[in-house]
Amino acid sequence: MQVLHVCSEMFPLLKTGGLADVIGALPAAQIADGVDVRVLLPGFPDIRRGIPDAHVVSRRDTFAGKISLLFGHYNGVGIYLIDAPHLYERPGSPYHDTNLYAYIDNVLRFALLGWVGCEMACGLDPFWRPDVVHAHDWHAGLAPAYLAARGRPAKSVFTVHNLAYQGMFYAKHMDDIELPWSFFNMHGLEFNGQLSFLKAGLYYADHITAVSPTYAREITEPQFAYGMEGLLRQRHLEGRLSGILNGVDEKIWNPESDLLLASRYTRDTLEEKAENKRQLQIAMGLKVNDKVPLFAVVSRLTNQKGLDLVLEALPGLLEQGGQLALLGAGDPVLQEGFLAAAAEHPGQAGVQIGYHEAFSHRIMGGADVILVPSRFEPCGLTQLYGLKYGTLPLVRRTGGLADTVSDSSLENLADGIASGFVFEDSNAWSLLRAIRRAFVLWSRPSLWRFVQRQAMAMDFSWQVAAKSYRELYYRLK
């Protein structure tokens, strides 16, 4: 079984979000599971620099100009790169310029990604041809459409990492991307009078996956589907929509071997975690005190992530004696709110605006509770890192958060399945009730340690996801 992942970024070569983490870990796990997997990426400068052995496999004159297909390796995974400097070698992010304006030719830049994915199934590399083209998010959404236009030379899977991003372009661009105009209708890639790369992936793929079982159910409902609920409900009824939970890259996120921690530990040596807490308290300007629970946030500061709820609930958390360590950036109003709270409560609240991968490890290793109160969360990785590090997640019951964290209720404690704290409603009162439950459990150190060990014993490795994807591919074949 030969599988080609088509996507726009890959950790650690290039990362703007969680998609990169998935592509940075899933292919290697699939190779270990016996699947012949390769990855197709645009030739962005950071990616090119990370694959110095890339050599030319093929050259083509395309609707987006002359390109070369390169092939190399990264960490044992075969990587195809689309070498098109006129499209991909630019300042700014992969998607927008330094002024945060989307590149005006994004329609060509990412249509080309889907087109090359299809051409791989038609023999663009004469020595390797995929049985399954696995496209990720809107950037690769046209790959299933091109495959459909070419008579489906390979099966296709489309994974939704976040349905909110839809890749919308003017209808006139149908003339530019070499897809038939017959595809531009409601039973195709048209959405609200425009061309939607996301809808193309959803409509033409042989199977759709979401990044958690709960999110796969949620996106069939209007409040989560951004207008796509009709199509997704139909795919669900046809058995062509499922959820496969993302995993944790244990080579990077593992408290037993994490060199970014002051003190490494396992579920059997949790007492070693205390030194990480002490160092984190010092780094964040908090009072060094191992008797109070240290709550943490590592997140984009947005309402979607529920950080407005944290800001509203923060006085109640601090009044109970807790501490807060926050690392993140985003909404200026939220940034200012948290900075003001830290200034008002020195020694109790510490805030760092920005994102630093290394410091996020130190927070995960040192905190007692990680807050993930998202309004929606397709999968979420932060809570998985918390479970792995014995930093109990406090989450809202949505998407992947609902699939991965079990509340420390009396019943769950008795059944040995408690792993954190879960609340239902998107309001500060509901969040504060969950925070109160965390304080109650904290007052019972032996129970707290029991839940930590339960959390750390859970298996959210990529090997589990790789097995599920392999079974899906073989069902399609």
From Swiss-Prot:
EC number: 2.4.1.21
Keyword Methyltransferase appears in the UniProt entry: no
GO cellular component, one term: cytosol
Residues binding ADP-alpha-D-glucose: K15
Domain of life where this protein originates: Bacteria
InterPro entries: Glyco_trans_1, GS/SS, Starch_synth_cat_dom
GO terms under biological process: glycogen biosynthetic process
Pfam families in UniProt: Glyco_transf_5, Glycos_transf_1
Pathway assignment: Glycan biosynthesis; glycogen biosynthesis
Keywords: Glycogen biosynthesis, Glycosyltransferase, Transferase
MF-aspect GO terms: alpha-1,4-glucan glucosyltransferase (ADP-glucose donor) activity; alpha-1,4-glucan glucosyltransferase (UDP-glucose donor) activity
CDD domains in the record: GT5_Glycogen_synthase_DULL1-like
Catalytic activity: [(1->4)-alpha-D-glucosyl](n) + ADP-alpha-D-glucose = [(1->4)-alpha-D-glucosyl](n+1) + ADP + H(+)
Class in the EC hierarchy, top level: transferase
Described purpose of this protein according to its UniProt entry: Synthesizes alpha-1,4-glucan chains using ADP-glucose.
Homology family: Belongs to the glycosyltransferase 1 family. Bacterial/plant glycogen synthase subfamily.
The protein's name: Glycogen synthase
Organism: Salmonella typhi
Gene name of the encoded protein: glgA
